[in-house]
Amino acid sequence: MKVTEVKVFPVNEDRLKAYVSITLDNCFVVRDLKVIQGTSGLFVAMPSKKRKDGQFRDIAHPLNQETRAMIEDLIFEAYEKELKSMGETLVSLKRQKAPGSDYGNDDY
């Protein structure tokens, strides 16, 4: 699987820094990934839906660490490029692990 396109849509909110869409193999789009400012750095949140019990569950997510790292690296690279094109820069792209990023746990 190859990520063939990353589109970053910056937003000006407190913790939410950008929405992101990725295209896989030029034939499948995943929308509503988010770049979020956490307590110890930025992280990528997968698309999610709020359940009846108030918890959020990923709609789509990588099944292993290698795929997650590859997607996150491409998103952070595109995010930093987008900021530079807007005249902004990150002093340091401090990253943290996404909360609840347990691979393969699809219990509903």
UniProtKB/Swiss-Prot annotation:
Q: Name one Pfam family in it.
A: SpoVG
The record's section on Gene3D superfamilies has: Stage V sporulation protein G (3.30.1120.40)
Q: Which UniProt keywords apply?
A: Cell cycle, Cell division, Septation
The protein's matches in InterPro entries, at most eight in alphabetical order, are given as: SpoVG, SpoVG_sf
Does Cell division appear among the keywords? yes
Domain of life here? Bacteria
Q: Which GO terms describe its biological process?
A: division septum assembly; sporulation resulting in formation of a cellular spore
Q: Which residues form a coiled coil?
A: none
Q: What does this protein do?
A: Could be involved in septation.
The record's comment on protein family reads: Belongs to the SpoVG family.
What HAMAP family does the database record attribute to this sequence? SpoVG (MF_00819)
- This one is known as Putative septation protein SpoVG
Q: Which organism is it from?
A: Bdellovibrio bacteriovorus (strain ATCC 15356 / DSM 50701 / NCIMB 9529 / HD100)
